[in-house]
């Protein structure tokens, strides 16, 4: 009677352990339904719809600086850049510092250039920015100097590029990508962008990743241009830009776009890493050298199936499986000990 009860308890424990093992998830993290099975265009379409934004009122750009994945909405339409122009403007000067053509102490309008860099990027000083491009020979000369930073195809530039302060989203992404991937050419510029506007524009909401950015703001009568461009330090840094034209809630839109693009980048980075990290089957053992004496025939070994490749995402779940399996083994041993002890005492 007692032995029967012990056997029933033993069976119940086995069932419980099997249920625990089956409950272990196949993946350590759930897929994000914002991105799963969606293209970048579809992700952005949902974003614009949720924010009530007319697609004609914005221009967007995105690039992963590691993989080169790149996307645009209205990428080749010229928009008022406002103070975002101070990024390529200072690229001219910082590259001159790097080459030895000038120093950080060279004075511009009474300021050493190091201070002028800070004031134009962190404080967005328009008067000083004007003096910087006038020192280069005037507006048109300055615009000609920044062409290599903005495009690989100078012939594609619209005449408005040289007449006024207009850029496209594609040009700004090209500029930021160059700044990030060849940052040693432009000493100090990204450091100043990291300090700019810690609570506004792309930073209007707290972000999960550090950003280095430069906003652009201009209001003409009832028309309002509020823009931002940034390097976002996700696992694989991305560069993004958003131009807006008289949006009702521009700061929310900017911050939410920044968050969305960072999350999009992380999602696809992790997905790609999982796909690339497949565990390959163990290599076949090297054949043993032939024996010198005639060997006694031995039966051929029974072939075993090679292990199936396992994705990194499944590998991430292995610690959970191992923990449950260890607990299962301990519980099984305990149940077995109790069971057989009962049999001996019977």
Where in this protein do the model-derived segments appear?
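Bacterial N-terminal signal peptides that target proteins for export
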Residues: 1-12
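Bacterial N-terminal signal peptides
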Residues: 11-22
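Mid-domain, small-residue-enriched loop/turn segments at the edges of structured enzyme/sensor domains
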Residues: 28-29, 72, 128-184
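Structured C-terminal helix/loop/strand segments within mature extracytoplasmic catalytic/sensor domains
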Residues: 29-57, 70, 78, 164, ...
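Active-site SXXK
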Residues: 68, 78-108, 120, 240
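Short, well-structured active-site flanking segments
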Residues: 95-114, 185-189, 309-313
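Active-site helix/loop module of the DD-peptidase/beta-lactamase fold
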Residues: 102-123, 143-154
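A conserved catalytic-loop motif detector
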Residues: 165-221
């Amino acid at each position: 009677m007692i032995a029967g009860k012990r056997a029933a308890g033993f069976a119940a424990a086995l069932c419980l352990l099997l249920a625990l093992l089956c409950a272990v998830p196949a993946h350590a993290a759930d897929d994000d339904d914002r991105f799963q099975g969606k293209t970048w265009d579809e992700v952005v379409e949902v974003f614009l719809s949720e924010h009530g934004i007319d697609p004609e009122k914005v221009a967007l750009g995105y690039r992963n600086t590691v993989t080169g994945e790149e996307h645009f909405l209205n990428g080749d339409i010229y928009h008022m850049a406002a103070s975002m122009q101070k990024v390529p403007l200072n690229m001219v000067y910082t590259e001159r510092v790097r080459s030895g053509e000038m120093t950080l102490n060279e004075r511009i309008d009474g300021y050493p250039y190091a201070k002028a860099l800070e004031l134009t990027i962190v404080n967005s000083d328009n008067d000083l920015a004007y003096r910087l491009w006038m020192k280069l020979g005037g507006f048109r000369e300055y615009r000609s100097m920044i062409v290599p930073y903005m495009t690989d195809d100078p012939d594609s530039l619209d005449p408005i590029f040289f007449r006024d302060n207009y850029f496209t989203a594609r040009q700004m992404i090209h500029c930021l990508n160059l700044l990030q991937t060849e940052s040693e050419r432009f000493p100090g510029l990204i450091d100043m962008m990291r300090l700019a506007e810690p609570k506004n524009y792309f930073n209007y909401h707290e972000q999960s990743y550090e950003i280095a950015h430069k906003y652009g703001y201009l209001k003409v009568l009832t028309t309002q241009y509020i823009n931002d461009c940034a390097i976002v330090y996700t696992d694989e840094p991305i560069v993004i830009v958003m131009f807006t034209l008289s949006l009702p809630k521009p700061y929310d839109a900017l911050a939410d776009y920044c968050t969305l693009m960072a999350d999009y980048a992380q999602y696809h980075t992790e997905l790609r890493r999982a796909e690339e990290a497949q565990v390959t089957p163990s290599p076949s053992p090297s054949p043993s050298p032939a024996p010198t004496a005639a060997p006694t025939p031995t039966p051929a070994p029974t072939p075993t199936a090679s292990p199936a490749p396992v994705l990194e995402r499944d590998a991430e779940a292995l610690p959970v499986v191992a923990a449950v399996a260890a607990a299962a083994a301990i519980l099984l041993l305990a149940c077995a000990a109790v069971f057989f002890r009962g049999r001996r005492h019977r």
